[in-house]
UniProtKB/Swiss-Prot annotation:
Binding sites annotated in the UniProt record for tungstate: 41-42, 75, 160-162, 218, 236
Subcellular location: Cell membrane
Annotated signal sequence range: 1-27
Organism of derivation: Pyrococcus furiosus (strain ATCC 43587 / DSM 3638 / JCM 8422 / Vc1)
Topology of this chain in the membrane: Peripheral membrane protein
InterPro entries hit by this protein: ABC_trnspt_W-bd_WtpA, ModA/WtpA
Gene3D superfamilies according to UniProt: Periplasmic binding protein-like II (3.40.190.10)
The protein's assembly and partners: Monomer. The complex is composed of two ATP-binding proteins (WtpC), two transmembrane proteins (WtpB) and a solute-binding protein (WtpA).
Binding sites annotated in the UniProt record for molybdate: 41-42, 75, 160-162, 218, 236
The protein's name in its UniProt record: Molybdate/tungstate-binding protein WtpA
Amino acid sequence: MREGGVMKKRLLALIVAFAVLTAGCLGSESKEVTLIVFHAGSLSVPFQEVEKEFSEYAERNLGIKVSFQDEASGSVMAVRKVTDLGRKADVIGVADYTLIPQLLIPNYTDFYVLFATNEIVIAFTDKSRYVEEMKSNPDKWYEILAREDVRFGFSDPNQDPCGYRSLMVIKLADLYYGKEIFKELIEENTNIYSNGTQIYAPKEITVNPGKIVIRPKETDLLGLVESGSIDYIFIYKSVAKQHNLSYITLPSEINLGDFSKEKFYGQISITLGSTGKTIKAKPIVYGVTVLKDAPNREVAIEFLRYLLSENGKRIFEKNHQDFLEPPIAFGNVPEELKPLVSIEK
């Protein structure tokens, strides 16, 4: 009997030890979260800094270890990963907020927040052809780009807002300067065309490779201009500054960075072959949302709360990107975010 009692005690001790060990494993597992973030390439630098700070904040204040699985792409592609490919994500951050109501609402999300701005510039290095002339006579930018020995680039308008915004900038230049700049730079070197103030970007774009280079997202062009493979790129001002590129600013009437010029910008629109959607030119505003079926929705909303706070603003402004004050939200805004935003109907 004594031996049987000892065996029972040992068995009970093993069961208790296993239960404690299992509970400990489950407990630590439940506190580790990976947020999946699909975002615009131009958000890469500030998002990485926000994510690093948020991870430290979450572990210290929420008791959660948060890691991030980031995928940078053109914003159109970021959205299509969800709508066309059925990919799961927690957070979507885009360089053109209108992609969210146009393509994600109501099936994939029910709210979005406008939070940051930007403008289009023309960036280059000391290796670029006619660089001194570009610096001293920036108003001649379209003449310099048109020269036979100059190559320039922009991102794919079917995948990336920076691409279709670059085309909008060039078409707006027609109106501002009273010259056929779009025809000379774009129509004579690609199958992209315009009819009046309407631009059409075919699903499959072809280019004269000796003149124009197109890449999926604007950050894919950085290495090409830095190496001297191409001379000039249309890119966001924040990205040019983050990567220490030289650049010229464009008139506010065409750079898509001035809210007071919204009516002038709105004369131009583009139809994308990739989505069939028509997008009207407007000031550049970034948008962010958490998807309805986000694998870690509660933590994703906490991340947005951190992003939209003074912490996110500080990081974005450090990285040369202006923050909306306050951010503007639409739709069924989560309660946690309401104190940080202005809610519009």
